[in-house]
């Protein structure tokens, strides 16, 4: 498959994989801001990320990648910040300094404390080193540890969403992680009532509903 495209076309292009929580974050941001984009699937199971053409777009061979004219951006956080700078409505960061810091903290916990411990590249590396039971324990421990920190961080400042009654940056990172906890990893959410409540709130929003893994162009017919 060729991933080389005309960078000078106006329409945004998102290189994505349906189950990637990192790509999921960007899909929410694009939809929340009402931006039209072309979805270009990168099948991580088949190794499309190692394709030489795709690596011209992202030398790391990961998703997501965003192409905006002659601009190419990799990494979900960088992409979302770029979109928020270029398309500032609705804003993804609150004006309140404390709430802004909480958004950054929650985002960091997801990016560094949870997601890296459960991604496909890691488990491919560990495939012959741990069994299925150990893999499940690894994932559960990483998510539980991160969710415990998030619950404590957000319980006192949360409204309908992570830092109030408006959707901000933290919500874009929390939603995919909580969705995966419920639907993919089957984590017991009883110890995390605040996060479970967010999940219900996110499911009411079209931008979040349309971004879920189960509704993407490359979602398999059977999961």
UniProtKB/Swiss-Prot annotation:
Q: Which UniProt keywords apply?
A: Cytoplasm, Detoxification, Transferase
What EC identifiers does the entry list? Answer: 2.5.1.18
Please name the CDD domains in this protein's record.
Answer: GST_C_Zeta, GST_N_Zeta
Q: Where does it localize?
A: Cytoplasm, Cytosol
Chain ranges of the GST N-terminal domain: 10-91
Q: Name one GO biological process term.
A: toxin catabolic process
Q: Which family does it belong to?
A: Belongs to the GST superfamily. Zeta family.
What's this chain's function?
May be involved in the conjugation of reduced glutathione to a wide number of exogenous and endogenous hydrophobic electrophiles and have a detoxification role against certain herbicides.
- Record-given protein name: Glutathione S-transferase Z2
Q: From what organism does this protein derive?
A: Arabidopsis thaliana
User: What is the primary gene name for this protein?
Assistant: GSTZ2
């Amino acid at each position: 498959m060729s991933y080389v495209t005309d960078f000078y076309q106006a329409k945004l292009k998102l290189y994505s994989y349906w189950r990637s929580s990192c790509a999921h974050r960007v899909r929410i941001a694009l939809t929340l801001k009402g931006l039209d984009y072309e979805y270009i699937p990168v099948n991580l199971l088949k190794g499309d990320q190692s394709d030489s053409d795709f690596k011209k777009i992202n030398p790391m061979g990961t998703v997501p990648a965003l192409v905006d004219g002659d601009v190419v951006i990799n990494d979900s956080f960088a992409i979302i910040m770029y979109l928020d700078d270029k398309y500032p409505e609705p804003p993804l960061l609150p004006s309140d300094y404390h709430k802004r810091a909480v958004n950054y903290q929650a985002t960091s916990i997801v990016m560094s404390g949870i997601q890296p411990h459960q991604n496909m590249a890691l488990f491919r590396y560990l495939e012959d080193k741990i069994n299925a039971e150990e893999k499940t324990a690894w994932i559960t421990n990483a998510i539980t540890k991160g969710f415990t920190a998030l619950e404590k961080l957000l319980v006192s400042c949360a409204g309908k969403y992570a830092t109030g009654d408006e959707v901000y940056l933290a919500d874009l990172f929390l939603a995919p992680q909580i969705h995966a906890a419920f639907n993919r990893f089957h984590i017991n959410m009883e110890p995390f009532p605040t996060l479970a409540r967010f999940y219900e709130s996110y499911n009411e929003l079209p931008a979040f509903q349309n971004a879920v893994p189960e509704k993407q162009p490359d979602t398999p017919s059977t999961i």
